[in-house]
Amino acid sequence: MKKVIVIGVNHAGTSFIRTLLSKSKDFQVNAYDRNTNISFLGCGIALAVSGVVKNTEDLFYSTPEELKAMGANVFMAHDVVGLDLDKKQVIVKDLATGKETVDHYDQLVVASGAWPICMNVENEVTHTQLQFNHTDKYCGNIKNLISCKLYQHALTLIDSFRHDKSIKSVAIVGSGYIGLELAEAAWQCGKQVTVIDMLDKPAGNNFDEEFTNELEKAMKKAGINLMMGSAVKGFIVDADKNVVKGVETDKGRVDADLVIQSIGFRPNTQFVPKDRQFEFNRNGSIKVNEYLQALNHENVYVIGGAAAIYDAASEQYENIDLATNAVKSGLVAAMHMIGSKAVKLESIVGTNALHVFGLNLAATGLTEKRAKMNGFDVGVSIVDDNDRPEFMGTFDKVRFKLIYDKKTLRLLGAQLLSWNTNHSEIIFYIALAVQKKMLISELGLVDVYFLPHYNKPFNFVLAAVLQALGFSYYTPKNK
């Protein structure tokens, strides 16, 4: 019986263990996680804060007990602090006692995920990660300075937003998906909200300005104070350095009763030796093949937020820390360990979606800006159209954008925005087209249906393709 050690038991680790032990009884699994719970869906934190999710416990889909019942040995509140590849052993620290022990493996699975980037309290931005402690409610024990990832963070935010009457103003550092969702939740809870980011537009890493302009407009209409293009210099604290009082930026001070850091994440790979031919990506994630084996290390699998996977759009290894990628990577790694080569994760394209301030947004592949940065000869096609025939009497506006390589006509990415009816699932088949490196001419000939209840003969995707190919006879109506 082969012994497998799994480092990390959240989305990727849970998926791996469930798949492996449901398909085979030939493995002994020892799993370590430094948290006290597993499988928490952090995407639901803002929903719980705003009251959409009534019971925070519903955001869990597995437990250590379930994995133990399947045959795994699961050790919670245990941190892997060292790795010896020659001896095939890990050094594990019990966070409750501080005691360190050694465990040996035949095959290793790194599912250690990523941790929020935290900024230094007093100095300029350092991007230094604070030491993990699952019992800490706040960043660096500074009251009301918090990150957003864990169940523990969710409980703190729920208390701060919905029960703590002293919290009247909230500053959010970062305008990515987490920051924007929390901004909406804080606004729904009646807080004064300021969003601070070095980017010029909210969600500027995920969408181009035709979409971020609409998001900015909706946020300002809701009364959100946007400080875009602003660099954080540090956090303002009380005299005893126990309570945060605001944020210092290069454009002035922002007073706040609660400050949330949602800058981004950094992979937890610090325990992996840097001198043993692992190929690290620029942010510390580890490059893997289509079976999630670390390059140059066939008995080490890296899954979830610690992995850098081939991106079919950029044609580079990318670390895209999404639960969808984590779950799929865990499944593929488990199937390969069992002996199957039929299931493989050949590529990702960063497909994502956002629903805030009445807008439905979705994207896949490269933005126009990123495509240009990657050296493509970029072409774009943007249409504003109604989602179904005007003769139906009721219809909603949709904005759709294609990004492609003008030299080859290869599809590089797409973005979608709808104001009322949600059409974000259209991005699913566009994602497949980007993954398979289809040409926009091929995309235009995909056999899709027409039914006036739902769409047009020349739907907004086809309209964008026709426009890109130079067919000027079709002009979208926009009412």
From Swiss-Prot:
Gene3D superfamilies linked: 3.30.390.30, FAD/NAD(P)-binding domain
Cofactor mode of binding and number, as noted: Binds 1 FAD per subunit.
Location of the active site: H11 (proton acceptor), C43 (redox-active)
Enzyme Commission number(s): 1.6.3.4
Positions carrying Cysteine sulfinic acid (-SO2H): C43
GO molecular function, one term: NADH dehydrogenase (ubiquinone) activity
Keyword Ligase applies: no
Domain of life of the organism encoding this protein: Bacteria
Record: residues binding FAD: 8-12, 33, 43, 80, 111-114, 149, 177, 295-305, 322-324, 450
Cofactor(s) needed: FAD
Keywords on record: FAD, Flavoprotein, NAD, Oxidation, Oxidoreductase, Redox-active center
TM regions (residue ranges): none
Binding site for NAD(+): 170-185, 197, 264, 353
Keyword Flavoprotein found: yes
Family the UniProt entry places it in: Belongs to the class-III pyridine nucleotide-disulfide oxidoreductase family.
Known role: Catalyzes the four-electron reduction of molecular oxygen to water.
The protein's name in its UniProt record: NADH oxidase
Organism classification: Bacteria, Bacillati, Mycoplasmatota, Mycoplasmoidales, Mycoplasmoidaceae
